Amino acid sequence: MTLFSSLSSLSTGSLKSSVSSIETGSSSGSFGSNETSGWGSHHWNSCHPCPPPRPICRPCPPCRPEPRCHYKY
């Protein structure tokens, strides 16, 4: 059973790294299509945090007029 537990921890670890690479990828500049996608909205959290139950939020209106929020990266 030791093999199985090490396998499962391995798969969750690789999943986390792939998720974080997606996050950094969407913050690298081209915000055109990313802006309305889940990953694009995720980066708006730096302007105004969303409520805890929703880690990825949809577009947040208060941030929109300020380009610095979206094009910071």
Curated annotation (Swiss-Prot):
Give the primary localization class: secreted
Which residues carry a glycan? N34
Q: Check the UniProt entry and state the signal peptide residues, or none.
A: 1-21
- UniProt biased composition (Low complexity): 1-38
| GO CC, any one term | extracellular region
Q: Where in the cell is it found?
A: Secreted
What keywords would UniProt list here? Glycoprotein, Secreted, Signal
| Region described as Disordered | 1-43
- This chain belongs to the protein called Putative uncharacterized protein DDB_G0286675
Q: Which organism is it from?
A: Dictyostelium discoideum (Social amoeba)
Q: Show the taxonomic lineage.
A: Eukaryota, Amoebozoa, Evosea, Eumycetozoa, Dictyostelia
